[in-house]
Swiss-Prot record:
GO terms for molecular function: calcium ion binding. GO terms for biological process: photosynthesis. Keywords: Chloroplast, Membrane, Photosynthesis, Photosystem II, Plastid, Thylakoid, Transit peptide. This is Oxygen-evolving enhancer protein 2, chloroplastic. It comes from Solanum tuberosum (Potato). InterPro entries: Mog1/PsbP_a/b/a-sand (IPR016123), PsbP_C (IPR002683). Belongs to the PsbP family. It holds the Pfam family PsbP. The keyword Plastid applies. May be involved in the regulation of photosystem II. The lineage of its organism: Eukaryota, Viridiplantae, Streptophyta, Embryophyta, Tracheophyta. GO terms for cellular component: chloroplast thylakoid membrane; extrinsic component of membrane; photosystem II oxygen evolving complex. It is found in: Plastid, Chloroplast thylakoid membrane.
């Protein structure tokens, strides 16, 4: 008897911690050192010359401590900005679509593959198509994304975004899958925010399939409603590549999405 694929959503409360920030304390204003040459007899000339040189050295050293850090100075592991000009982020390129905008990884290429209803944009990694992003725009009668319910309830209404399993039938798969299930979806984080007067939902999901590779997929979803349209941006990467640097590109792409 055929059995359809099911995704089981398990909610995990992600703990957030704000990174510690250190504030720089301005160095005290260097004390002015005054050297006065006094007439001494010939026996003290050498001693006075040494004293003047020592005072001058202290004055220069104190002034150096009190001066501002040059833009050319670099933190450990960073290249020095010799000319003091602001560095440009060349890892991402701005993209302005019809009613939306986002940052796309510079080394990802446009793709013509259509996966979801209303899809208007798709980019993928040059070396691994599992790492990709897409934007879909569909009509809706909702006035706000909150009209879909909570972020978790919204995800249940658009669970097609998490992908479909090709196998249909009874099976007992290894890897922690329930009997008869060949796919799981774990909701790692769900949040909302107001940007430019619009409410946004942010979802982080880890999906796994019994026949999949990469150890699963990290899928980040950003969604909002504007002028009778539901805007969804989904960026993803395989679990292995996620921890090898893809996380940076997927997170930036998903969180940079907004209504233009």
């Amino acid at each position: 008897m055929a059995a359809s694929t099911q995704c089981f959503l398990h909610q995990y409360h992600a703990l957030r911690s704000s990174p510690a920030r250190t504030s720089s304390v301005p160095s005290p204003k260097p004390n002015q050192l005054i050297c006065r040459a006094q007439k001494q007899d010939d026996a003290n000339n050498t001693s006075n010359a040494v004293s003047r040189r020592l005072a001058l050295t202290l004055l220069i050293g104190t002034a150096a401590i009190g001066s501002k850090v040059s833009p050319a100075d670099a933190a450990y592991g960073e290249a020095a900005n010799v000319f003091g000009k602001p560095k440009e982020n060349t890892d991402f390129l701005p993209y302005n679509g019809d009613g939306f905008k986002l940052q796309i990884p510079a080394k990802w290429n446009p793709s013509k593959e259509i996966e979801f209803p209303g899809q208007v944009l798709r980019y993928e990694d040059n070396f691994d198509s599992t790492s990709n992003l897409m934007v879909a725009v569909t009509p809706t009668d909702k006035k706000s994304i909150t009209d879909y319910g909570s972020p978790e309830e919204f995800l249940s209404k658009v669970d097609y975004l998490l992908g479909k399993q090709a196998y249909f039938g009874k099976t007992d798969s290894e890897g922690g899958f329930e009997s008869g299930a060949v796919a799981t979806a774990n909701l790692l984080e769900a949040s909302s925010a107001t940007v430019g007067g619009k409410q946004y939902y942010y979802l982080s999901v880890l999906t796994r399939t019994a026949d999949g590779d990469e150890g699963g997929k990290h899928q980040l979803i950003t969604a909002t409603v504007n002028d009778g349209k539901l805007y969804i941006c989904k960026a993803q990467a395989g679990d292995k590549r996620w921890f090898k640097g893809a996380k940076k590109f997927v997170e930036n792409a998903a969180t940079s999405f907004s209504i233009a």
